[in-house]
Amino acid sequence: MTAFRTLDDADLADKRVLVRVDLNVPMESGRVTDETRLKAILPTIRTITDKGGKAVLLAHFGRPKGRDESQSLAPVAKALEGQLGRKVAFASDCVGEEASSAISRLAAGEVIVLENTRFHAGEEKNAPDFVEALASLGDIYVNDAFSAAHRAHASTEGLARKLPAYAGRSMESELAALTKALEAPVRPVLAVVGGSKVSSKLELLGNLVKKVDILVIAGGMANTFLAALGKKVGKSLCEHDLADTAREILEKAKAAGCEIVLPVDAVVAKEFKANAANRVVSVDEVGDDEMILDAGPETVAVVAQKLDGAKTVVWNGPFGAFEMTPFDAATVAVARDVGKRTRAGTLLSVAGGGDTVAALNHAGVAGDFSYVSTAGGAFLEWLEGKALPGVEALRR
């Protein structure tokens, strides 16, 4: 992890530390309904306050067009108080006199949340005058919001160019896990890429075939590959117009020495609904009026066999329509298998993306994986091999 400056490198005593955090939490009737993201930033806040710094938290919330009280961070600051077990101040703006006087009242070791950065158009435009206004409020900048690191905004990228910049604890652990899984992995590396559409994961597949040893293609996107190989997929979700693209990806994989694993059997039904009448068939036997809704047990067995030789797993996307029983079976079986091997110490496992996290929670194994990233877009862009502006700004 020497590539990034961390809080261990910083002198924080009596410094105003601007911390970019992810406070985009679910809310109902002005109350936070899931505090997972608040818990994730506690180690960074505590490191700063323990070292005598003043923690000044910056974040966006929702997509307001200008000032909108329904998108205020005030209720989030209140919820954070409960998590921290201490008072958290709140300023009703993130720049200007209101913010600077509130920060000037802070004693060493105290915490304040500034109002939603997106109340100002300069945030998403990364406008120089807005960056300057934010920078004037702090001595040091810390980014602890990996989930927003793919955005070159004022509070994620602009500030890091203005002030001495460091990675927070959550950012640090995310970068360590991803570097371990893809940049300098213990091989063989097996990747699972699922989900409904090839079109949304073209760059991802193109990058992974060059980086991993085995690529398991699952979910609706596997149907596009099966169709490209001449299989009949009936009424299944399938991007027939991407057949040439699918074949190109298979050729790229072959040239790179990456083994592709596609489903060998499938759970099919005539209706897309929970508990619909279904049967397990070989991928050569899908009826014209049937749709593939999950991978079958033979496919699960093939993946298990490939896992026997793997040392690292990177997972993004489910095997089937996991939100509906019984079409969650393959996702649950493989997730539990990976979780069990990770617990036994034979596998390093990293997973990420919204559907993936939901699927692992559904299988009850999110806690068994080495690392589960809640950063949807940023996690995908990292897997695609793209430089993330918010991360690049933290390099030594």
From Swiss-Prot:
A Pfam family annotated for this UniProt entry: PGK
Gene3D superfamilies with a match to the protein in the record: Phosphoglycerate kinase, N-terminal domain (3.40.50.1260)
EC identifiers of the protein: 2.7.2.3
Keyword Cell cycle: no
Localization (cell): Cytoplasm
Entry keyword set: ATP-binding, Cytoplasm, Glycolysis, Kinase, Nucleotide-binding, Transferase
CC terms in the record's Gene Ontology section: cytosol
SUPFAM superfamilies found in the cross-reference section: Phosphoglycerate kinase (SSF53748)
CDD domains from the UniProt entry: Phosphoglycerate_kinase (cd00318)
GO biological process, one term: gluconeogenesis
Catalyzed chemical reaction(s): (2R)-3-phosphoglycerate + ATP = (2R)-3-phospho-glyceroyl phosphate + ADP
Stored InterPro entries: Phosphoglycerate_kinase (IPR001576), Phosphoglycerate_kinase_CS (IPR015911), Phosphoglycerate_kinase_N (IPR015824), Phosphoglycerate_kinase_sf (IPR036043)
EC primary class: transferase
Annotated GO MF terms: ADP binding; ATP binding; phosphoglycerate kinase activity
Pathway: Carbohydrate degradation; glycolysis; pyruvate from D-glyceraldehyde 3-phosphate: step 2/5
Residues holding substrate: D22, L23, N24, R37, H60, F61, G62, R63, R118, R151
Residues reported to bind ATP: K201, E323, G353, G354, D355, T356
HAMAP family with a match to the protein in the record: Phosphoglyc_kinase (MF_00145)
Family in the record: Belongs to the phosphoglycerate kinase family.
Assembly, per entry: Monomer.
PANTHER family to which the protein is assigned, alphabetical: PHOSPHOGLYCERATE KINASE, PHOSPHOGLYCERATE KINASE 1, CHLOROPLASTIC-RELATED
Protein name (database record): Phosphoglycerate kinase
Species annotation: Xanthobacter autotrophicus (strain ATCC BAA-1158 / Py2)
